[in-house]
Amino acid sequence: MFACKNCGGNVKFDIKSGQLACEYCHSLFDPYAYEDKTSDAEVQKDFDATIFTCPQCGGEILSTDDTAAGFCSFCGASTVLYSRMQKEHKPAYIIPFAKTKDDCKQAYMSLMKKAIFAPKELKDPKFIDGFRGIYMPYWTYYVTQKAPISLPAKRSHRSGDYIITDHYRLEGDLDAYYKGLSYDASSSFDDNISEKLAPYDVKNMKRFTPAFLSGFYADTADLPSTIYASDAMDAACTNTVSEISKEPAFTGLSVDSDSAALSPLSLGTTVKETDYSMFPVWFLSYRNKDRVAYATVNGQTGKVVADLPISVGKFLLGSLIAAIPVYILLCLLTVLTPGMTLTIVGVLAIIANICYSQELTMIAVKEAGTEDKGRIAKEQPEALGAINNRRRLKAAKKATKTIKKKTNTSFIAYFILFIFVIQFVPALFAIIAGIGGSFGNADGSLILFVILTIISFIFSIRAFSSFDRMPGHKGVAGLIFGMVSMLIGDAVLLFQPVLDAWYYGAAFIIIASVLITLINVIRAFNVLTTRKLPQFATHKGGDDRA
């Protein structure tokens, strides 16, 4: 804790002034005025810090203050954190907070205005006031590239019935320097969040002194700098190829992403220096039973990255409202016979199953943590080689995309898509529903519906294989009900009852299964936008009173 030099009161870092401000007499002080003045020539490599530990998840956070922390930002637990004093490794640089808590809350609310299906709790002013300022640890890499290069490139064009591809060699002497390629140095900070929060402007880094932490908390590095060294070199290669492609003479050329010429070795890529730094993040956690969602704001730029779950009730209500005009258009385009109605709901069932199966596949990838290199480095270090290869291939493909002139067509594209959905999707349903009639008899409708049933079963079986990743294995009963409902539709078309009530009854059962599947899709989406409650042996959590 730092004391005011005038009145002895507590001083904290004031974001607006960039100085330490006294809470009582409002005096301002340079943060470097509180540095230890030692007679030793050697610069101190450690500083005194209070380590707070969450009793529920084992998360740890450090502070220069000794006031008891009462909230863990990483697991969302409202509890008094245990504390102890210890020496911490001193970072070389720090980017002080530039965005105040009010700036952070305004940026978050701007995002929430667009999130119409988000739970109301996420928009509660009391909840939003829970943002905490945390300095997250980063490794900052300084990368050089110096080598003669020869990149294979090609350009294709059509001539009559032929596609002609011209091959080129882009040759020259490369001399590039990248300053401040940064990656989070904490296994507790999800790589997906840190990558989306980027970039930070390293030009505004300042030499670290503990006084900058006054009034805030900080996570500490538990990953060695070697973990992300290959990523820094790959990022340098990606940017270099992108810059080369932007040269006017090379416009329209694409570089072979599988070429060995794009490797860090071929481009003479070397990490010359690495610094341990701290970057500012406003952090908020939302806990729902055994899952937690995070909202983060870049403390320098104000960029917001948030996990936004969906309220089941809001989404179903919105879907119902959106379905009404589509149903009206469908009725205007064709006469809905009982057989057509049954076929249409069968198509809807397939679409729902495809969405659900895809969500479960994505959950399997996320829960395995294979996209979070920091987590894998702590839990499965033997898998790092495969992850590095996958990330390198992804970076190479990103670098070799053909450079095209940017045009302001996004609004036009969305408008065209909207017109397509409104005008043609109902017609498409009508065409699909009428295919059975084109066979000339009821057997055609049965054949079509059997095909729909088989497709639905394929995606249902695929979904079954991923259920072990779903919390509580929820959704199994709904999936079975969906399969049974499709078989009921097959039975109705097979026996061809005289009463229309049989067809509409089967259609109603299938619609009910679609509704259940839709709810399961939302639940699966919420699993994707939340995370398992963290449990760490030595983990970093967070709390802040700024």
Locations of the language-model features?
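Short functional micro-motifs and their immediate structural scaffolds
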Residues: 10-12, 30, 62, 80
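Short Cys/His-rich micro-motifs in 6-15 aa windows
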Residues: 26-33, 75-83
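Short cysteine-rich clusters marking metal-coordination/redox-active sites
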Residues: 4-7, 22-25, 54-57, 72-75
